[in-house]
């Protein structure tokens, strides 16, 4: 992939929405230096950070709260930075994620000053994979908070947000740090349903009786040497939709399947064409039963809550089956090389990638995901903070149904090598769940832990290690190389 193409993708295609304005740089007020630079500790070791204030740090005191798996409070304390530094420490006594929330005791300044031009570079809100263009959960509220407001401004131009600070990407004055204790030993919080495989094998068998009835419609592209189409496929109870991009030249190409972030939106087909120009046969799959060019399609914004108390009615049942249907269609194409199928996506796109690799283990060759959602959905019942899709833990029917759509229960079926990047302070795709999912995969996998990152719609640039690793692996695979996951460094 050319440098210009990489820069274009990074600067344009990862932006969640054109409505999100460039964020104002925010100087770092507090710096947290972990005792272990990779944030990973053994059981019995002291987990800790040295905290130093920056030149613009407020003088008020900070309270810190240590939580196991961001759920169970273990210890609280106060930062005293009067000497120029302080520390936060706790001993990890079991396989777990440590989440530390740091907040000021005193009220934040009533009228915060604007940041100086020497602050950190502005981040972007966007995807963890090469194709995404949508908002992740809560991205809209984040954008509103960080891109300014037109309220009280008749001209309608956004006003700069007030500078409050913090490191979680929310500009709310709060900080968080995270660490992992023996993370490769984190196990399932809830047993896998005994009929899990029978349930999904039955659904796939039923879908196999439905004719594909593929409808392929050419669409324009401005990328030279590439042709594009829109597809619609009959699935079990719904239709799968998306875009296809391929090189114009006749040949057989490796397949790249792009799965989408949470939200309802029109797909951006330009990155599909860019990947096709690199030599991929690309299928970009809409998460919903709607035309990929349609920004809404009548899909409810709270689709993740639809049917969430019944595995037969869950919105994610049809979503996962549509994803599988795309592989059925791929097998009919004469321009596919007949062997390579790479799945990639971020957040809910990562969730779908893991699920599809588990549903169709003999068809998928590689899985590359960042901040994958949908893991450990019952975590709230067992001392682990659960994340998206945010199924209600106070509803036992919802918790029972969730297990059939949880990535941790698909992971044991996966045969392909998996690369997964995730943040240690992510509250949308909590890291304890991602570790749990990875630990269920029997084959090779490559964790890419990013110790200082929230979900990447909040702290996009911090997730660059995963974005960069994805690009490198794709460049290897499109040239016919073989991806071998790197082992976790101690």
Predicted segments, located by residue:
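Acidic catalytic loop of the alpha/beta-hydrolase fold
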Residues: 424-429, 456
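Alpha/beta-hydrolase fold nucleophile elbow
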Residues: 335-346
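Hydrolase active-site cap/lid region
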Residues: 350-397, 449
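C-terminal catalytic histidine-bearing segment of alpha/beta-hydrolase fold enzymes
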Residues: 393, 435-490
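N-terminal cap/lid segment of alpha/beta-hydrolase-fold proteins
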Residues: 35, 39, 76, 205-250
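Cap/lid segment of the alpha/beta-hydrolase catalytic domain
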Residues: 262-324, 376-388
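Short beta-strand/loop motif that positions the catalytic acidic residue
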Residues: 414, 420-422
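Short beta-strand element of the alpha/beta-hydrolase
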Residues: 244-246, 252-262
